[in-house]
Amino acid sequence: AWLKDRRIFGDLPLSAVVLWLVVAAPSILQALMPGLLDMFRRDPTLIRDGQWWRILTSVFVQDGGLAGTVANLLTLAVVAPPAFRLWGAARGWALFLLGQLLFGLLTTAVFPSTGAGNSGATLALAAAAAGIGVLVRPRMPEIVLTAVIVVGGATLVTVDDAHGFAVLSGALLGAALVTLFPPHSMDARRAGESLRPSAL
């Protein structure tokens, strides 16, 4: 990881657990307090009226009932640990929140819809690994995986599913982050290549 992240239960990043709890707590509490959904969900009309915070707060509640809540929280539980091991705590949080911000803006301005859930931010966090995969380890498996992710995101866009933009924006965020702040292994490899006789 680029930034040190405290681990618990072996190789499980504490920051990933905290992220899951921050999202899961209000989502589960929503079963006892249904009014939380109306209070935090994304509503383009209310957002245009000045309640801009709904773009971000909508990630902490779920609009898919029990099945949707379980699916979203399970997906986050699978995605967050490896993502935070890869990116570190600060960058992992940044990617999740930026993914939610972009998804919220798109579903407010481009694909106006009322809703809630962490699916967009989770997909962006997962897709960010595609951006780093090709740049750090440009081998066939990474290239194929990135191509599948990008094509999948583009396909969702063509059927007017805003989650496609979450996938594509996540991949772009990952590529931008690894380009601006490359991991040490990438720096070392580039330095080694520059010192080869063929490069001199």
Predicted regions span which residues?
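N-terminal TM1-TM2 helical hairpin plus the immediately adjacent luminal interfacial "cap"
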Residues: D11, A16-A94, A109-G115
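Aromatic-enriched alpha-helical transmembrane segments of multi-pass intramembrane proteins
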Residues: R6-L21, G50-R54, R137-D160, A191-S198
